[in-house]
């Protein structure tokens, strides 16, 4: 089983991933993105999908017109893990 993040690792997320926040209702991190239009939002989602495949770790997400919300959590760990951090950092590189 994949280990969950420790309390110290969670506390470090504020500095490590300043654009992400802890989800209110579950053990996950989330980030909201806004783009000029739907085409840009969908293009971003396509790039994230390819990245997620490379990481073998897939986000939960939603899209409404020019907005994309991404939520990361590791089901095998029952919450946040290092896999979520690595994918969030990679997604930040695309934004």
Curated annotation (Swiss-Prot):
<keyword id="KW-0456">Lyase</keyword>
<comment type="similarity">
    <text>Belongs to the pterin-4-alpha-carbinolamine dehydratase family.</text>
</comment>
<protein>
    <recommendedName>
        <fullName>Putative pterin-4-alpha-carbinolamine dehydratase</fullName>
        <ecNumber>4.2.1.96</ecNumber>
    </recommendedName>
</protein>
<dbReference type="InterPro" id="IPR001533">
    <property type="entry name" value="Pterin_deHydtase"/>
</dbReference>
<dbReference type="Pfam" id="PF01329">
    <property type="entry name" value="Pterin_4a"/>
</dbReference>
<dbReference type="InterPro" id="IPR036428">
    <property type="entry name" value="PCD_sf"/>
</dbReference>
<dbReference type="GO" id="GO:0008124">
    <property type="term" value="F:4-alpha-hydroxytetrahydrobiopterin dehydratase activity"/>
</dbReference>
<dbReference type="GO" id="GO:0006729">
    <property type="term" value="P:tetrahydrobiopterin biosynthetic process"/>
</dbReference>
């Amino acid at each position: 089983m994949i280990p969950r993040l420790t309390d110290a690792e969670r506390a470090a997320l504020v500095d490590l991933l300043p654009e992400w926040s802890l989800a209110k209702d579950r053990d996950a991190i989330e980030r909201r993105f806004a783009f000029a239009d739907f085409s840009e939002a969908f293009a971003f989602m396509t790039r994230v999908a390819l990245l997620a495949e490379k990481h073998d770790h897939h986000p939960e997400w939603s899209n409404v017109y020019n907005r994309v919300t991404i939520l990361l959590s590791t089901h095998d760990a029952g919450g946040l893990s290092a896999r979520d951090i690595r994918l969030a950092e990679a997604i930040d590189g695309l934004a």
